[in-house]
């Protein structure tokens, strides 16, 4: 008899405790503020890496009650509109989704508080190696210079080839002139030889009758 009364009393206490928790959860979803025992669940802004500053997004959010089948830190409640925003599955989740919600729904509030550009410097988790600032411009200028040098080299090579061909043409022209001069000189020598031969023949013809008839004119 006493045991049954104890069990009934314990069941009544458990039911009252459950009703109290449900009431507190309803107050959370309606006002967006934590009350009762959930105040201790107020999230302390967690840095993503040691030595980094706390995210300013937590000025506008607090962790929502855990949902069945989800990580306790997955959902956060917006203090401005009371909506619950998913931060993504897993443990090491950032505040990117929170900043997106603030920028899309409460941009004016962010600008008033001076946090309009704050989301851009949060969650510095690069997916790959960061290139130095301006590296693309430097590469562009370098490629442009290389292209200019290649074009200049190509034009220079064409100019050299053109000059070489011009020199070859001039050399062939000089050779032709030299051969023509040699032919002219040879022709002149032949003419001289012919003229000399003719003179000698004439001279012999003149001397021949005088030798045959020495007293012909006496």
UniProtKB/Swiss-Prot annotation:
Residues 1-24, 104-137 are annotated as: Disordered. A zinc finger (BED-type) spans 52-113. Residues 1-11 have a biased composition (Acidic residues). SMART domains: ZnF_BED (SM00614). Signal peptide: none annotated. Induction: Induced by TGF-beta. Transmembrane segments: none annotated. InterPro entries: ZBED2/3, Znf_BED, Znf_C2H2_sf. Coiled coil: none annotated. It is found in: Nucleus. Residues 105-114 have a biased composition (Basic and acidic residues). It holds the Pfam family zf-BED. Zn(2+) binds at residues 78, 81, 101, 106. SUPFAM superfamilies: beta-beta-alpha zinc fingers. One of its GO terms (biological process) is positive regulation of keratinocyte differentiation. One of its GO terms (cellular component) is nucleus. GO terms for molecular function: DNA-binding transcription factor activity, RNA polymerase II-specific; DNA-binding transcription repressor activity, RNA polymerase II-specific; RNA polymerase II transcription regulatory region sequence-specific DNA binding; transcription cis-regulatory region binding; zinc ion binding. It comes from the Eukaryota. Keywords: DNA-binding, Metal-binding, Nucleus, Repressor, Transcription, Transcription regulation, Zinc, Zinc-finger. Expressed in keratinocytes. Transcriptional regulator which has intrinsic repressor activity and which competes with the transcriptional activator IRF1 for binding to the 5'-[CA]GAA[AC]C[CT]-3' consensus sequence in gene promoters. May thereby play a role in keratinocyte differentiation. This is Zinc finger BED domain-containing protein 2.
């Amino acid at each position: 008899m006493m045991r049954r009364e104890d069990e009934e009393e314990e069941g009544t206490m458990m039911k009252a405790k459950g009703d109290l928790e449900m009431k507190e959860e309803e107050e959370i979803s309606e006002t967006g503020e934590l009350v009762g025992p959930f105040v201790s669940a107020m999230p302390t802004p967690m840095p993503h890496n040691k030595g980094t500053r706390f995210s300013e997004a937590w000025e506008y959010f607090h962790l929502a009650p855990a949902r069945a089948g989800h990580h306790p830190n997955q959902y956060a409640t917006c203090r401005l509109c009371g909506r619950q925003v998913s931060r993504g599955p897993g443990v090491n989740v950032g505040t990117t989704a929170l900043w997106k919600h603030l920028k899309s729904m409460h941009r004016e509030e962010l600008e008033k508080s001076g946090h309009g550009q704050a989301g851009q410097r949060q969650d510095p988790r690069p997916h790959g190696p960061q290139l130095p600032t301006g590296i693309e411009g430097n590469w562009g200028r370098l490629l442009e210079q290389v292209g200019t040098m290649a074009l200049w080299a190509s034009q220079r090579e064409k100019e050299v080839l053109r000059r070489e061909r011009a020199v070859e043409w001039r050399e062939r022209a000089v050779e032709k002139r030299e051969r023509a001069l040699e032919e002219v000189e040879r022709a002149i020598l032949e003419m001289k030889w012919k003229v000399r031969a003719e003179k000698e023949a004439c001279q012999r013809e003149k001397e021949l009758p005088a030798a045959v008839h020495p007293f012909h004119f006496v």
